[in-house]
Amino acid sequence: MRRGLIMLAPALVAGISFASTRYARAEDVKLPATLTFTAYDTGTAGFNIAVGVGKMMKDKYGTDVRVLPAGNDVARLAPLRAKRAASAAMGSGTYFAQEGVFEFGSKEWGPQPLQILLSTVDCNCGSLGVAADAGVKDLKDLKGKRVGFVVGSPALNQNSLAVLAFAGLTQKDVKVVEFASYGAMWKGLINNDTDAAFGTTITGPAKEAETSPRGLIWPPLPAKDKDGWARMQKVGSFFFPQAATCGAGITPDKPIELGNYPYPIFVAYASQPADQVYAITKAMIVNYDAYKDSAPGAGGLAADRQTKNLVVPVHPGAVKALKEAGQWSDAQDAHNNKLIKRQEVLGAAWAEYGKSNPPSDDKAFLDGWMKARAAALAKADMPNGFED
């Protein structure tokens, strides 16, 4: 591990708050002496990018950044919610957490008002990687095959279902194999416990799988297949077509048409101080050159490469930093305000549902919440997004 970057077990992180009274200064950025980020498992793209950003903060500001790996979305957000981390490097789970669906529809969670600092879209994509010895050429060939799911990670599982939907397949058409974490799922592919796993093309585990005896392929998602993309976006609205030019088994001269969305997405809670979020975001923007080559995918964090008008709002502190970089518009501001209003509607609906004496049974509780959620969004004339 590079100097200044410490990977901690959850038990050790429990005693560390991102709030600090001792600050390190450089230019007009003020960072605490210690910061904690959460990310996907060790070796993943999200983890490696967080490490690269952390090294920059150590080199430029003397800030020690601790990157805490976590195997699912719930584990990534728990330290952030408890104010023991400053940011989480998330994926599409950001959206599911905001919406209060899947695991985030449980009594312990509900809608989470997450807001974005910066996100990255680079030369990589995200899709189902398939063992080369599984007899799969196209996605439709996954029918009857084993597909890895991660317990407690609705994002990864929904992403897998979205890719399957491209080929007209559903969960019933494959054999779901559950794993405890993202890393365990990819180990399962290497060890012949599953045939397919969702991930980014640049994730470390995918590269391990490619060099393993099983090998790895990425079945294509051609952009010209409009029906396939319509099916896929119905399940994962945040996906868009993109040609991957980097990753396991992929080069610029051998691109593969796949799908993508911003990953990682560095998020904070709406309640986190704007000046703190501003400082972190500003540091990432002005020192971009110091970490852009630190890990595959890090280059996409540039201020002028930010995906505009995502389904989750940008934090006011990050908005300030983006405005100063000349990368924010009135149209984005209007869109952002609508998303913040959506989070307020969802939060109010959750509070009201909690007062309605909801069922104690977990499934009945979730079913009741989804109905209350749908009613609140309809009343506010906002799209549901999870009708099916």
Residue positions per predicted region:
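Immediate post-signal peptide segment of exported/extracytoplasmic ligand-binding proteins
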Residues: 21-37, 135-146, 329-332, 383-387
